[in-house]
């Protein structure tokens, strides 16, 4: 994977973000997602690569495009595996709320964990706490470790948690330590990545979210040197989601076994979820967020704000791109 390919991967998320942003605030989350999917696949098709979707919009019979196993690209060139979420935070986009973005992770063939469409317990933390916090420790223990590693008082730590009923006890425990809780309604990828940067005001992500997004978060944090661990959740009593109504713990365990997962309780480290030699994360804002701005439509141009993180050169590049419309008369700087 070279720098030219990485630039094209950036353009993939930019085009997905622009397509989805045209429906920001319209209350049409499914349409916004579909627009992003189509734009992402179209741009991928123009890249000289043998691409494969390992995490996408669902199984082949569930999604018309970017389904798991779909081949993308020209069919020649380097082999690249992708984990994609063309519109992360569809509800956020539909309601013009902060934090929606187009994201993906990429690596050479075989470099990304093919996460099942399950839930995942996650722990993300800054590089200073890597290998010191642990997903098997209590929230209280991890918060005290974070405080010591970062040199920040417990009362000044901000812990991001998805605002879900299943996290009632977790939130209560965090607050009992004196740390602050920042609940989010959707989209935990950006919060996880924010843990990898100092000065974002986000010190840790805890709790249960979607497993596929966990792989994308792991790819970014691995490249940043941050901490990420994930553990699959298969018990409906733990997940506490309407999506799993009627499912059983035993049935989910059987599904995991069919997928080749022999140890359903395994704790995955970042370098297991994103194990490739060359791992790239790319994200482009649909709406304004913690790390970058959303798409801005001007009379003569469209502006995108994006982030690319790569293990190729251990870099994180924030990119502000002006997409000039044909016949443009003037281009706004800001």
From Swiss-Prot:
Alphabetized UniProt keyword annotations: Calvin cycle, Carbohydrate metabolism, Hydrolase, Manganese, Metal-binding
Catalysis: reaction(s): beta-D-fructose 1,6-bisphosphate + H2O = beta-D-fructose 6-phosphate + phosphate; D-sedoheptulose 1,7-bisphosphate + H2O = D-sedoheptulose 7-phosphate + phosphate
Coiled-coil intervals: none
CDD domains in UniProt: FBPase_glpX (cd01516)
UniProt keyword Transcription regulation, yes or no: no
Residues that coordinate or bind Mn(2+) 2: 85, 88, 213
Gene Ontology cellular component list: cytosol
Residues given in the record as substrate binding sites: 88-90, 119, 164-166, 186-188
BP GO terms, sorted: fructose 1,6-bisphosphate metabolic process; gluconeogenesis; glycerol metabolic process; reductive pentose-phosphate cycle
Transmembrane parts of this sequence: none
Gene3D superfamilies hit by this protein: 3.40.190.90, Fructose-1,6-Bisphosphatase, subunit A, domain 1
Keyword Hydrolase set for record: yes
GO molecular function: fructose 1,6-bisphosphate 1-phosphatase activity; metal ion binding; sedoheptulose-bisphosphatase activity
Binding-site residues for Mn(2+) 1, renumbered to this chain: 33, 57
Lineage top rank: taxon: Bacteria
Protein name: D-fructose 1,6-bisphosphatase class 2/sedoheptulose 1,7-bisphosphatase
